[in-house]
């Protein structure tokens, strides 16, 4: 819901058995997204899917509440990413 700067670099590390990442879900926050990013996306003529993450149930409820009534077509809950 709030702005997140993400984790400091390096965010990705290649190992012999695969790749590790710890991106930190960098984003401007839901209010800035609605104000600054959504108008641009609306002009694209494509389906708009908002992927939201939170630390507690209340974060998800509040973020969805703020997105309701906007031009977002779908909301995806990111409940599996520990970042």
Report the location of each language-model feature.
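Flavin-dependent oxidoreductase catalytic cores
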Residues: 1-83
């Amino acid at each position: 819901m709030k702005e997140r700067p993400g984790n400091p670099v390096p965010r990705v590390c290649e190992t012999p058995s695969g790749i590790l990442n710890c991106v930190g879900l960098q984003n401007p926050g839901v209010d800035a997204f609605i104000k600054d990013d959504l108008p641009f996306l609306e002009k694209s003529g494509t389906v708009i899917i908002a992927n939201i993450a939170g630390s507690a149930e209340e974060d998800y409820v509040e973020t969805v509440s703020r997105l309701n009534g906007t031009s977002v077509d779908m909301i995806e809950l990111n409940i599996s990413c520990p970042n």
